[in-house]
Amino acid sequence: SGKLYRTATPPMDPAESHLRILPTTTRSDVGLVTNDGIAHAVHVSDLPVSTPGLTTQLPDPESIIGTSQRVVGLISWRSEATYALGTSQGTVKRFTGPLPDKQEVSLIALKELDEVVGIAEAGDDSELTFITNEANILVFPASSVRPQGRGAAGMAGIKLSDGAKAIYFTSLKVTKDTQV
């Protein structure tokens, strides 16, 4: 189950801020992206207020977006940013916002038994990262993945051995201090 909250308190570790914080206002919409590849529009003011680390019970995503799917990421609904998502079968896809005026938008055409494991903002200067259940990691330039339309199926991102799957995907801004 995903952890959903809005707060004025940033996470304790600034290096992880891209995983939890999305600059927004109380009058804007965000997209809660679920493992089935669908972005669900949510008005920021409809998200419960809590303090990370001090709240023992976080809200159930089903009560907010009406689905039992797992929330894997958060995106800005109206931003013209470019995002990348990765799937458990190793597919990667980039697309550019803003998202259309709908309550739900499919972001990727998933293959059978595939699911989204992560989504993040990914400009051309970013590095995309997959981690597998076999402890393999692949880091490659986001610029090597051409942005596609929202209905497209993406492209091969990481080659997986039989029985392996990607369990995590994100985008990193690499600096001279970045260690992977």
What are these regions (language model features)?
Residues S1-V180:
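Short, structured "edge-of-domain" segments at secondary-structure transitions
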